[in-house]
Design a protein with these regions (language model features):
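Helix-loop-beta segment of a Rossmann-like dinucleotide-binding subdomain
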Residues: 7-18, 56-69, 119-126, 171-181
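Internal alpha-helical scaffold of NAD(P)-dependent oxidoreductase catalytic cores
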Residues: 32-105, 110, 114-155
Length: 203
């Protein structure tokens, strides 16, 4: 969830952030320097799941794992990974611009994940609360401003993105699950990365 450590590798945003690391995700660029972003292949994970106990995962819905190279090419290694996932019964589309999908998911993560963790509500319960929905819309509007500044195309509306999330019954996003389990929260990749980009680009 959130923006990956390799996000600006060959990103072509025409901003000063191209080919730099995100401090909020990768402090001092340690992952960038150690793993090298050329080794990265991006993946947007859509299934809604819950860890019931170690080794036991409850799958609520979803079977799509969108894949993409940071440079947007459809490489042989990308095709191979996609083929393996498809042969396993999953959907694994190969994307030339995975970053758009990363932001569509981030759109929900930065709002629903955080407010579910703060309120303890499931996604469908959030959909029934006008006050929370109003706050979610405002958060998504701010996220969209930042994304568009670095070339992201939001091909669905805020209302449709909200409908998609709140249609999932009885599910709490991973941030709320982590909070309830006493695990570290993924706040920096989900929220901190957006704030960092906004500050660096004076948005």
């Amino acid at each position: 969830n959130g923006l990956p450590w390799w996000y600006f590798h060959e990103a072509k945003t025409q901003t000063k952030l191209d080919n730099t690391h995100l401090e909020s995700v990768d402090p001092k660029g340690k992952i960038w320097k150690t793993l090298n972003p050329n080794s990265a292949i991006g993946c947007v994970v859509y299934p809604a799941c819950e860890i019931l106990e170690p080794g036991i995962i409850k799958h609520t819905e979803g079977d799509r794992f969108s894949l993409g190279e940071p440079n947007g090419m459809i490489s042989e290694r990308l095709k191979e990974i996609s083929s393996i996932l498809i042969d396993s019964g999953l959907k694994a589309p190969q994307k030339k611009n995975l970053r758009d999908e990363i932001w569509i998911k981030l759109w929900g993560n930065c709002s629903f994940n955080i407010l579910s963790a703060l309120t303890g509500s499931t996604l469908d319960e959030i959909g029934e609360n006008p006050a929370i929905l109003n706050l979610i819309k405002k958060m998504m509007e701010e996220c969209k401003l930042v994304g568009e500044e670095i070339g992201i195309k939001f091909r669905v509306s805020i209302d449709d993105r909200i409908k998609g999330a709140t249609s999932i019954q009885g599910h709490k996003p991973s941030t709320a699950q982590d909070l309830e389990a006493g695990k570290p929260l993924e706040i920096d990749p989900i929220i901190g990365s957006i704030i960092e980009i906004g500050k660096k680009l004076n948005i």
